[in-house]
């Protein structure tokens, strides 16, 4: 790392004189316009009738020093929540917009889709410190304008790379904080060389011990870019690599071991009644009995000879690490993943009316989970075995590796025509995906099983290939009727073909394989229309937009007893008003999102922590989003936003497991129940202080109750929480060598709140001890918490 930073400094110094001379011959505004052309196809046009939040380069660059992943910055905008498995905001991280999870949020980088084509998620852990590479971000809530890649059912996030710098420069940064979290990185630009060339690069890495047990790890990213430009033309190649080896905790802080639940009223105290009172209702209760950092992927609750959970003298439950057969400790469950993006883009400012851009892209990804499986049934891996006496072996400890290899490649093109009252953008995106899913058993504690299946070192228990083709074409136009009025129209056609075959990682109880033979094609037409009126700082807008979305892989492979998945449709209606004055601004946005066959989270997880979903025939989300800010003094500003919503399923049939039998379910009908993971209120408040070189921000965030399934049962929910963070920066501007020196401190969760921001639930009807009514059944919750009070200090030097 020291060698890399030294090389940055040498390259920067050597290029200074020549680059400064050449930079003078270019108009920087024209260079910025060429970058704007690259993202014009996926961003809302000026005055477009959508709910939009823009994040500036300075905010992105400052946030990148925290080591946290980008969703935690996005969570400062209306209607967004974020959380991470390790409790610190680094590594494996997730987000929701308007209650819609990652797979329903379209994300692009310079117009190139970033969502993994099969599961439609973005793996933020593989985007460490990306904020330092970006020039801006635009978040569109709701359907928004047409974009490339998967359909937007919660929102669209358009990331734009920073404009190549005409002048040479460099930056190094170091951060250190709680739980031994260390973030470091640097970047450089040669400035303009030979009147046409710019070379730039960056490297960032975050190491941490993690708040949750067994979540230590490291993740990082690197970037290398070459730009060739003329006054109105630019070709740019970007190579962005990502790597991670991070400890996993997708089960969260689970209230129990396996089928034995610690939740109040669901614990078996030895009487076989499963109704003992433990006093555990939420994550705070788990923390108070010594289980606040408990991770079932790393350890298990200790039990006595009677099979009951053991406490110490202080009333805290004891845990014990997983062990291998030789007595050594299992290190931890890890996600090991490498990804490399290659983007070659060209943008051309043709004349006063026409601009165009095209990008070729290729992404390679490869990785696997390495996981200890305690006391698992053999049939889950397609195994059968007997001991020397011919007795069937039913369970053993295992280590498995579940992995995938991905190749994604395609082309993105768009052209923009502006003349008189017209602003027209047309374009297309064509993308192809090839992937392979695989799973190996690499260890078992049972000698008989090992001799039968692992004599060659490992045993492949599933293997599946996948192919996905995605092509979309769009045309969007804005017409200015008068100085105050504009109308908008947007049409998109999208074709998707998905095929997967091979055998899945699901086996019947007699160890028979689950063969996959899925071949689906979808054709979607997504029209949108709206208007905008603006005068003297006032703006009123409205729109109606349709979007469709195909099922993701898990909808086919982990569907349980629910019907075969269907594509979903959304009609999104937005109406808003904003006002901007010299010292204050305010805005309100109303929305109604009407879903047909919406994929709704069931509250269950796949066995690698993915949220499982199923189609719901009729559902809706409606709400109001408020934003306001005022600067009463030159050194003080106050801002806030609020997202208040109602998220309902009109009618819903729940499939409830009976007596833990895989093929026995009861169906329970609900009317007008609240959608899972959809809080009715998300509030953010900010107080910003800036005086000379000092900047300080107080940020308080409130999230209301979240139900973990779709039954609107308070027992199976996460209570509301409020958390406050404070950050302070001080900037020095030396006159020589170092352009800026920035010292920063981040204080997170300053009131040390104990809360979970996400989770999962399993519930069942157990007839052995009497039929539980729907509001009092057996249940177990996994809480995904954030850490209590933490802090991080950072230093940034800019040259």
Question: Where are the language model's segments positioned?
Answer:
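N-terminal periplasmic "start-of-domain" segments of outer-membrane beta-barrel proteins
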Residues: 31-65, 94
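Extracytoplasmic beta-strand/coil segments of soluble accessory domains associated
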Residues: 71-113, 135
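Short acidic/polar hinge/loop motifs at secondary-structure boundaries
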Residues: 113-141, 160
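Transmembrane beta-barrel wall of Gram-negative outer-membrane proteins
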Residues: 176-207, 212-251, 255-299, 342-352, ...
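C-terminal beta-barrel architecture of Gram-negative outer-membrane proteins
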Residues: 208-209, 676-736, 751, 756-760
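Structural signature of Gram-negative outer-membrane beta-barrels, strongest in the C-terminal barrel
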Residues: 429-431, 455-595, 631-633, 643, ...
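Gram-negative outer-membrane beta-barrel transporters
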Residues: 483, 592-594, 614-710, 794-798
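C-terminal beta-signal and adjacent terminal beta-strands/loops
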Residues: 596, 638, 646-648, 704-708, ...
